[in-house]
């Protein structure tokens, strides 16, 4: 044990993974960190393996993916692991953010951890979009065309930026090459950000807990207690992931992407992957192109303002009935946006999307501050002598 505490590298591992004192009362909702680290590890290993057989060329990209599926030993397994773990990654990140919002993990002194987490979400979305373009099916081509064209909404220089991203006048070889290079690079940036996220949490006050109070009264070392606890959810995760990979690998994908990209034929509906749908719905609900793009990016960055707009004296919503109702309405609204993002742009989905978009932003900028002030007043009234 002595080398663990004296070796310059091992003592860092020891302080984070072995001796790290965790609050004794943290629930399974605090297990997402290990699951997300596992997802990132799977994505990097399977991604590097796929890159060994992939060709980033307009003529060969689709065929190289088919070659991986048919000719490479267990290539189908590597590809389906990569695709389905991406979905699992986002599902767990959304749960992780939901837990953070519920238990007030964004409040001081964890504000930096929360800000880095929001940057991680943005980088994840960029990485996922770049990866979705690479198989070069119909949805890849048209998704890339639509999303990169958003840059043309920027006044004066927009069209130049789009052509700079494409490396030409449409999605072509240069586009696929640069998307492949960036898609390969960004997971390593993600790993660095995840490390920063961990350091920011570890070097302030450590993990929060379901009571929202200081955890210093009762703590346990990370090993073996929380390692075993993490293993429980890791095994459950592998079981669920295996069900998707082996029995329904394309359940979360789009059948249109099994059709080779054809610039002369537009698919019936251009829809991104399910985990980007809520933000796509916000983009589409605003008729003005520039305002739609601003709203879509603001929807992600709105998470950053939570430490400022939540004026409550209590951490988390577990003991605040009004905030709890507001939180569950927000979650339901997010799921509604996810559904609307997959629908055609027609009545009543346009109107529903606009209502949901207003409600989404109102939650961060109006509902949270107003409700927290009301609850502060009620607490003061109740505790006044």
Curated annotation (Swiss-Prot):
UniProt KW Cytoplasm keyword: no
Record's bilayer topology term: Multi-pass membrane protein
Manner of cofactor binding, per the entry note: Binds 2 heme b groups non-covalently.
Any one Gene Ontology cellular component term annotated for this protein: mitochondrial inner membrane
Binding site for a ubiquinone: 202
Entry's transmembrane regions: 32-52, 76-98, 113-133, 179-199, 226-246, 290-310, 322-342, 349-369
Binding-site residues, heme b b562: 82, 183
Record's subcellular location: Mitochondrion inner membrane
Keywords: Electron transport, Heme, Iron, Membrane, Metal-binding, Mitochondrion, Mitochondrion inner membrane, Respiratory chain, Transmembrane, Transmembrane helix, Transport, Ubiquinone
A molecular function (GO) term: metal ion binding
BP term (GO), one: mitochondrial electron transport, ubiquinol to cytochrome c
InterPro entries: Cyt_b/b6_C, Cyt_b/b6_C_sf, Cyt_b/b6_N, Cytb/b6-like_sf, Cytochrome_b, Cytochrome_b_C_euk/bac, Cytochrome_b_N_euk/bac, Di-haem_cyt_TM
Binding site for heme b b566: 96, 197
Pfam families noted in UniProt: Cytochrom_B_C, Cytochrome_B
Cofactor: heme b
Subunit and partners: Fungal cytochrome b-c1 complex contains 10 subunits; 3 respiratory subunits, 2 core proteins and 5 low-molecular weight proteins. Cytochrome b-c1 complex is a homodimer.
Misc: Heme 1 (or BL or b562) is low-potential and absorbs at about 562 nm, and heme 2 (or BH or b566) is high-potential and absorbs at about 566 nm.
The protein's role, per its UniProt record: Component of the ubiquinol-cytochrome c reductase complex (complex III or cytochrome b-c1 complex) that is part of the mitochondrial respiratory chain. The b-c1 complex mediates electron transfer from ubiquinol to cytochrome c. Contributes to the generation of a proton gradient across the mitochondrial membrane that is then used for ATP synthesis.
Similarity comment: Belongs to the cytochrome b family.
Protein name: Cytochrome b
Lineage, highest ranks first: Eukaryota, Fungi, Dikarya, Ascomycota, Pezizomycotina
């Amino acid at each position: 044990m002595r080398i663990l505490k004296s070796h310059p590298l091992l003592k860092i591992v020891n302080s984070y993974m072995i001796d790290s004192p965790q609050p004794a009362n943290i629930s399974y909702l605090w297990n997402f960190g290990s699951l997300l680290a596992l997802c990132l590890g799977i994505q990097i290993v399977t991604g590097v393996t796929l890159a060994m057989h992939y060709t980033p060329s307009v003529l060969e990209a689709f065929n190289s993916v088919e070659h991986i599926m048919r000719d490479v030993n267990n290539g189908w397994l590597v590809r389906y692991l990569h695709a389905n773990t991406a979905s699992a990654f986002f599902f767990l990140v959304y749960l992780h953010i939901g837990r953070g919002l519920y238990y007030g993990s964004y409040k001081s002194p964890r504000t930096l951890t929360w800000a880095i987490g929001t940057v991680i979400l943005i980088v994840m979305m960029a990485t996922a979009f770049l990866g979705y373009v690479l198989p070069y099916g119909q949805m890849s081509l048209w998704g890339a065309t639509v999303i990169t064209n958003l840059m043309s909404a920027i006044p004066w220089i927009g069209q130049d930026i789009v052509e700079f991203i494409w490396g030409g006048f449409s999605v072509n070889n240069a586009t696929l090459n640069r998307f492949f290079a960036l898609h390969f690079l960004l997971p390593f940036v993600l790993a660095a950000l995840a490390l920063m996220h961990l350091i920011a949490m570890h070097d302030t006050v450590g993990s929060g807990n379901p009571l929202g109070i200081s955890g210093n009264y009762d703590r346990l070392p990370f090993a073996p207690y929380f390692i075993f606890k993490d293993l429980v959810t890791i095994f459950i995760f592998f079981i669920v992931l295996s069900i998707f990979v082996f029995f329904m690998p394309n359940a979360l994908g789009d059948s249109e992407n099994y059709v080779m990209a054809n610039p002369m034929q537009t698919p019936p509906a251009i829809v991104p992957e399910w985990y980007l749908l809520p933000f796509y719905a916000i983009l589409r609900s605003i008729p003005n192109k520039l305002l739609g793009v601003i709203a879509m990016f603001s929807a992600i960055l709105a998470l950053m303002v939570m430490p400022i707009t939540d004026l409550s004296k209590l951490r988390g919503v577990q003991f605040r009935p009004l905030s709890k109702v507001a939180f569950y309405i927000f979650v339901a609204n997010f799921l509604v946006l996810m559904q609307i993002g997959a629908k055609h742009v027609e009545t009543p989905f346009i109107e529903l999307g606009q209502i949901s978009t207003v409600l989404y932003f109102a939650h961060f900028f109006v509902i949270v501050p107003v409700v927290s002030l009301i609850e502060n007043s009620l607490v003061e009234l109740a505790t006044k002598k």
